[in-house]
Amino acid sequence: MSLVYVNVMIAFLISLLGLLMYRSHLMSSLLCLEGMMLSLFILGTIMILNIHFTLASMIPIILLVFAACEAAIGLSLLVMVSNTYGVDYVQNLNLLQC
C-alpha cells in the first residue's frame, strides 16, 4: 500500500473522527462530511487510474455530483435553521419535525 493511499485513508478517518466528536454545530458536521467525500473522491480517482479501468472513470464524477447535492441541501438546511433559531446547533433539527 503506497503512502498516497495511507494519507487519503488517514484524511478520511480524521474527517470521520471530527464528525463523531464535533456534532454540536451543523456547520462543523457539514465540513467533516465534505472532507469525507473529498477523500473518497481522491481515493476512487487514484484507484481507477492505477488499475487502468477506463469504464469506471465516471464513478468519481458521479460521486462529486452527489457531494454537491448533499452540500446544497445541507447549506439550505443550515440557512433555514440559522434564520429560524439564530444558532446552528444540531439539536435544533429535532424541532423541525412535523
UniProtKB/Swiss-Prot annotation:
What's the name of the protein?
NADH-ubiquinone oxidoreductase chain 4L
Q: Does the keyword NAD apply?
A: yes
How does the protein's chain sit in the membrane according to the entry? Multi-pass membrane protein
Please give the organism. Urotrichus talpoides
InterPro entries, alphabetized: NADH_UbQ_OxRdtase_chain4L/K, NUOK/Mnh_C1-like
Spell out the subcellular localization from the entry. Mitochondrion inner membrane
Q: What is its EC number?
A: 7.1.1.2
Q: Which Pfam families match?
A: Oxidored_q2
| Molecular function per GO | NADH dehydrogenase (ubiquinone) activity
Q: Where are the membrane-spanning stretches?
A: 1-21, 29-49, 61-81
What is the protein's quaternary organization? Answer: Core subunit of respiratory chain NADH dehydrogenase (Complex I) which is composed of 45 different subunits.
One annotated Gene Ontology cellular component of this protein: mitochondrial inner membrane
